[in-house]
Amino acid sequence: MKKLEGKVALITGAAVGLGKGIATVYAKYGAKMCLVDLLPEVEETAKELRETYGAQIVTYVGDVSNKDHMKEAAKKAKEAFGEVNVACCNAGVCRLAPFEEMSDEMRDFHIDVNIKGVWNSCQAVIPYMLEQGGGSIVIASSVTGDIVADAGEAAYAMTKAALVGLTKCLAVEYADRHIRVNCSQLGYARTPMVEKMAIESNPDNPESAIQDIAVGVPMKRLADPLEVGELFAFLGSDEASYLTGSQIVIDGGSTLPETMSI
């Protein structure tokens, strides 16, 4: 039996990048899914996974920062498959700017997607999980904010660090009702979002910016979204049945080196 067979997962930000990687691994392991994204390309991702893995998938095109949208997405998963066992709260944004130049609109954009989006997703699925006697929530945080930070990332770092606190609070609140809540803390992965950041950092040679990142990682490369998907699959499965409130770093060792040495 595949590790996610019989599980129903709601995955946000599932059209491209990390979300598509997570959805691909979940399909490989037999999960039924509701894929959520603001991008209509989520339909193409679903079609691809149905054809490749025979996965049972419904989609919802909507905005995670809109509470009603997330309630509708969770309801769609429930109506299609009978329950919601796992929520992968992956949707997120990152825009770079010097702090003194960062607009209120840019700050609020990060808060709306990175914090409110996860909040809304959790509030949408938890009632179903309580009704069915448990579930697993996996939140995509980051090493940025809670462990490390770089100039220009104030809004992103602030919002991703907040998700660690949310993870721990929800884990404590729902542990005795069999809902596990964990978060991944990702370094850099080769995704459209990172490629966009590279363009913002070095418009003339974005590939050079990506290679500069890889040089600073002990493993000398960025993560593949499928590797992140494997972590999300473990946390969503019964293999992680005694794991809650955890922060799992998946960064190729990038946060390990001392910044200064003799």
Predicted regions and their residues:
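Substrate-binding pocket helix/loop in short-chain dehydrogenase/reductase
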Residues: 98-99, 103-111, 209, 213
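A conserved structural motif in NAD(P)-dependent oxidoreductases
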Residues: 204-205, 217-228
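Active-site helix of classical SDR
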Residues: 122, 159, 167
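Active-site loop-to-helix junction immediately N-terminal to the catalytic Tyr of the SDR YXXXK motif
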Residues: 102, 148-157, 169, 197, ...
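Short C-terminal tail/terminal secondary-structure segment
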Residues: 3-5, 244-262
